[in-house]
């Protein structure tokens, strides 16, 4: 099943986990520590109380990362990636409804794939643009760069885990996300060393 189909079929929990996982993997671009999104993950694991806490947690994270409208891009791949990451956080819905979460999960999915494409030297050389992101999300994955392929696999796995196991799948989803965040942090660090 393609990523687009998985998002279309996901329930509120799956959509929230999918969007949050994409955002969490991109935390290195936001300047936050690895635990900054923990309260949002915790609110997903709780039932009705979590729904009430979600909006408050979103606002707290935004305040910690100083996001209003997001930073201006610098024209570099890193600058564009930072803008996309801030847009994901800025688009996080304060109200956890299926419609809000579906839109956010979709935005986060596209942005995360674009970020990984921007930061992957192979993908840049291949000019992996918006049409390629759409192709990837719809299941056309030939000639995909390794970094983008890994991000696509993680997005699909998170949605499948939560669909199959409900709240019990959140722990594994978070573990996958932590792995992806480490990979992106290493890529960002390597690119920074290359510029120095």
Identify the function of each model-found stretch.
Residues 15-16, 33, 78, 94, ...:
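Alpha-helix N-cap/helix-initiation sites
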Residues 56-69, 76-89, 105-106, 112:
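Internal, conserved structured core segments that host functional sites
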